[in-house]
């Protein structure tokens, strides 16, 4: 095994599309209490006014429920839902085809909106502000601009890289909403609900064990639940207990903090090859044979949230918690006393 277990990666996999396990309303949705409370107000206000809800931007690490919240918004607004992604919208005509087919007050969800091409983004501006499309017809001296009126709609954008959004695009979202990692208690509720939906008997200690190792991410919690249920059915009596959960997750390479082989390789690399850092992100990515984006978007957010690493102007450094977790003695060289003393 040379790379991290995809079970613990927060990117969407085909099995994550099981809609039966997804909450269907804000009432069912667990976690993100502040975001849910605000969305409930904005949704109710839009319904009372009979207008499209303001454009909304969800940002934060992957797997926290951006797509699910967008679908719930459309359902509670009582309107249609269309879904696409930034890389799919390669040219203005792709976006125009979607926008011109929206019904009044529909929700259009664009995942990975930070990956929109500049030419498509330019077409999106008047659509967001004036509900109109300005398209250039023809070429050269004969070219002319044609304005097409659109039905009022709500754009919901989702991004894991808020800093990559251009300022003009970011400023056109009236409701920017950051999604946070989930608490262990919240994930426990999600796992227990998932087990019930799957028709699996579970012990509180069993669901808690999965929640503890799910990296604060519901998508990962759902994946781990499915794998533990597999072990419970094949190697147990079908009941999700703490013992079967611990055995299954340990065999999957998931430790008690939720770190997998990829995370431990990252920490081990900095500890053993670079004395705990600082070391540049490009060096880390090259040594792990990963892209810089993969390291910054997939591996580092949870390590930062857990206080295992530090980002400094000179590069990444291990925090004392990382040394302790890996069972490695930190170096006693110059400059280490403040961090590890």
Curated annotation (Swiss-Prot):
Superkingdom in the source lineage: Bacteria
Chain spans, region Large ATPase domain (RuvB-L): 1-182
Top-level EC class: hydrolase
Name of the molecule in the record: Holliday junction branch migration complex subunit RuvB
Subunit structure: Homohexamer. Forms an RuvA(8)-RuvB(12)-Holliday junction (HJ) complex. HJ DNA is sandwiched between 2 RuvA tetramers; dsDNA enters through RuvA and exits via RuvB. An RuvB hexamer assembles on each DNA strand where it exits the tetramer. Each RuvB hexamer is contacted by two RuvA subunits (via domain III) on 2 adjacent RuvB subunits; this complex drives branch migration. In the full resolvosome a probable DNA-RuvA(4)-RuvB(12)-RuvC(2) complex forms which resolves the HJ.
GO cellular component: cytoplasm; Holliday junction resolvase complex
Domain notes: Has 3 domains, the large (RuvB-L) and small ATPase (RuvB-S) domains and the C-terminal head (RuvB-H) domain. The head domain binds DNA, while the ATPase domains jointly bind ATP, ADP or are empty depending on the state of the subunit in the translocation cycle. During a single DNA translocation step the structure of each domain remains the same, but their relative positions change.
Binding residues for Mg(2+): 67
Catalyses which reaction(s): ATP + H2O = ADP + phosphate + H(+)
Organism: Cereibacter sphaeroides (strain ATCC 17023 / DSM 158 / JCM 6121 / CCUG 31486 / LMG 2827 / NBRC 12203 / NCIMB 8253 / ATH 2.4.1.) (Rhodobacter sphaeroides)
Main location per the UniProt record: cytoplasm
Location of the protein in the cell: Cytoplasm
Keyword annotations: ATP-binding, Cytoplasm, DNA damage, DNA recombination, DNA repair, DNA-binding, Hydrolase, Nucleotide-binding
Chain positions covered by the region annotation Head domain (RuvB-H): 256-341
One Pfam family named in its UniProt record: RuvB_N
Annotated binding of ATP, by residue: 21-22, 63, 66-68, 129-131, 172, 182, 219
GO molecular function: ATP binding; ATP hydrolysis activity; four-way junction DNA binding; four-way junction helicase activity
Function: The RuvA-RuvB-RuvC complex processes Holliday junction (HJ) DNA during genetic recombination and DNA repair, while the RuvA-RuvB complex plays an important role in the rescue of blocked DNA replication forks via replication fork reversal (RFR). RuvA specifically binds to HJ cruciform DNA, conferring on it an open structure. The RuvB hexamer acts as an ATP-dependent pump, pulling dsDNA into and through the RuvAB complex. RuvB forms 2 homohexamers on either side of HJ DNA bound by 1 or 2 RuvA tetramers; 4 subunits per hexamer contact DNA at a time.
């Amino acid at each position: 095994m040379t790379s991290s277990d995809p079970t613990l990666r927060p990117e969407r996999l085909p099995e994550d599309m099981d809609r039966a396990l997804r909450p269907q309303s804000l009432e069912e949705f667990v976690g993100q209490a502040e975001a849910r409370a605000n969305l409930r107000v904005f949704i109710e206000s839009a319904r009372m006014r009979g207008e499209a809800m303001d454009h909304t931007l969800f940002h934060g690490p992957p797997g926290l429920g951006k797509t699910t919240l967008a679908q719930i918004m459309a359902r509670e607004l009582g309107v249609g839902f269309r879904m696409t992604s930034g890389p799919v919208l390669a040219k203005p005509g792709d976006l125009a085809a979607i926008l011109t087919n929206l019904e009044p007050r529909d929700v259009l969800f664009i995942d990975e909106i930070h990956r929109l091409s500049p030419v498509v983004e330019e077409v999106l501006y008047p659509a967001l502000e004036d509900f109109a499309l300005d398209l250039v017809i023809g070429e050269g001296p004969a070219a002319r601009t044609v304005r097409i009126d659109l039905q009022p709609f709500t754009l919901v954008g989702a991004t894991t890289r808020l800093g990559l959004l251009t300022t003009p695009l970011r400023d056109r979202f009236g409701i920017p909403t950051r999604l946070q990692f989930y608490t262990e208690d919240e994930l426990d509720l999600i796992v227990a609900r998932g087990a019930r939906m799957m028709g699996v008997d579970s012990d509180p200690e069993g669901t808690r064990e999965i929640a503890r190792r799910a990296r604060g991410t519901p998508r990962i919690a759902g994946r781990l639940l499915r794998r533990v249920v597999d072990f419970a059915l094949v190697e147990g009596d079908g009941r999700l207990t703490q013992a079967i959960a611990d055995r299954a997750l340990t065999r999957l390479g998931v430790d008690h903090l939720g770190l997998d082989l990829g995370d431990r390789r990252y920490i081990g690399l900095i500890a053993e090859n670079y004395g705990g850092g600082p070391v540049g992100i490009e060096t880390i990515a090259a040594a792990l044979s990963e892209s810089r984006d993969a390291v910054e978007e997939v591996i580092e957010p949870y390590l930062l949230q857990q206080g295992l690493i530090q980002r400094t102007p000179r590069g990444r450094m291990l925090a004392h918690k990382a040394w302790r977790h890996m069972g490695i003695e930190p170096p006693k060289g110059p400059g280490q006393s403040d961090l590890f003393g």
